[in-house]
């Protein structure tokens, strides 16, 4: 059953990377003018800026800072490099707290020079090392399972079932899951695993875009909602059946859309959100 229609923008969040050509100040101004209520901030947009002041600026534009992207990339054969990743994730947690958001999304990483099982253990150990720091900072860690095509270098966590297993292993309110339709729409167990995620209180974030047919780039050819084959309304229905009523985050990496006029693209995002999500 499809959920109720989205008639306003009260739950619409857009990731800064979706409109990558804009700096964060321009994004804040344009999002606010369009009636968008939430923003997820990618860490690269904060470089060279006072993070606390940037958070204040975003809130002054009426934007809720939904989450920060991204932490993770824990696995490496080299123990020294694994420690560098932990250190960077600690900084990411501190940045999220300073910015004024309570969620840090984790793209967990993988090392193709070692077995996936080793990468998965290193992800578990990395999150375990960070969880006390996250709790002290008031920042929840959202494990984002990625499509299996990214199991080589981007993430060894590739199904929602696996992300649920890992989150539940910590028994912590500070470790949960981010559900991104681009990575999970194909999974025959998706409805069941979304329900499970909600039952354990672990559903921290919901990301939308579309899967284009054909897809011409495995990373940078995501579609605007309605351009592809993902059953967005159905999946949103499953998410909302868990009791989730948070922001719906538009996350689109697209060389095609980044070449377009970004103000026009923003208008299309708003229309597609109402029509197809």
Question: What spans do the regions from the language model cover?
Answer:
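N-terminal substrate-binding region of glycoside hydrolase catalytic domains
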Residues: 30-48, 69-72
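Short clusters of hydrophobic/aromatic residues that line enzyme substrate/ligand-binding pockets
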Residues: 74-76, 224-225
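Active-site-proximal loop/turn and secondary-structure-junction residues that shape catalytic pockets
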Residues: 18-20, 43-45, 71-74, 108-112, ...
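Conserved beta-strand positions in the central sheet of alpha/beta enzyme cores
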Residues: 40, 67-69, 105, 142, ...
